[in-house]
Amino acid sequence: KTIWVKFPLISNEFNNCAIVIWTTTPWTIPSNKAVAFNKDVSYGVYEVIDTESECWLSKGELLILANKLASECFKQARVLNAKKIKNIHFKDFNTFKTKHPFSNLAGSNEFWNYEVPIIESSIVTEETGTGFVHMAPSHGAEDYEEFLKRGWLEKLTHNVNEDSSFVKMMPIFGGLEIFNKKGKEGKANEEVIQKLIEVNCLMARGRLNHSYPHSWRSKAPLIFRNTKQWFVSIDKEISNIDNSDQKLSYGNTIRERALKSIDELVSWFPKSGRNRLFSMIETRPDWVLSRQRVWGVPLAC
């Protein structure tokens, strides 16, 4: 399922105006925390002039889209005629504010009543979509990296359980599954789409055949969740090192010690094994100790 979603602006010179995003994962919309644009993409404000009878947009609505992608977006939304009324410079986004599509959803208990920041990011392209990317840092690595470098990790949500169901505390969607126990699509995606229609924030919907990650063990589809883990920082300097002690002279970090030990403390048979292990440790990120596995959680003691 693919959807085009309106994020209403709450502070700009136009009334009834929204930024439009496109996503293939409707279930991530409840966890949205930002909208991203690219300063190298040209944008415009478009007014809907005429539509087909079955269309979720209304005449007179204003939408901000990438100029290169606007025509295809309106085609998907069954808009017969739209005109560009203004170009948007990327610096203009610094003055814009938007809100979550579910901010006024009945029964939401103000769960989504927060300002959604508009941020600049190079992950946004003009290849497909709208020229904007909806950011759910709890469910996407690139989204997470954008929040990490801004020091925004406190904004992360944990709305999805290990079994792919929304947490019970979430209004409206609590308990709904993204995928069921048989690996088939659950009710979450469709319910999110229906609520977007209810709050008049769905521009269009469609279907797209694309690759999707699956478990190599069970062959079931996967979802991405940001969860708390224990890590070993392999590049952090180890304290209280007595450099006079020969046993502690292999380096000041775990990585340095491991690499030096490979060459000075280990005899290799065959020697090709040394290169494989050395290159792996030389480039590996911090070591996650608590990585969940099907058969258990190994922890170093």
Q: Where are the model-predicted features located?
A:
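Residue patterns forming the tRNA-binding/recognition surfaces of aminoacyl-tRNA synthetases
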Residues: 1-31, 49-51, 95-97, 107-108, ...
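Protease-associated
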Residues: 34, 43-132, 141-145
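Electropositive, beta-rich accessory/interaction domains or terminal extensions
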Residues: 37-39
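Intrinsically disordered, low-complexity segments enriched in small/polar residues
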Residues: 41-44, 210
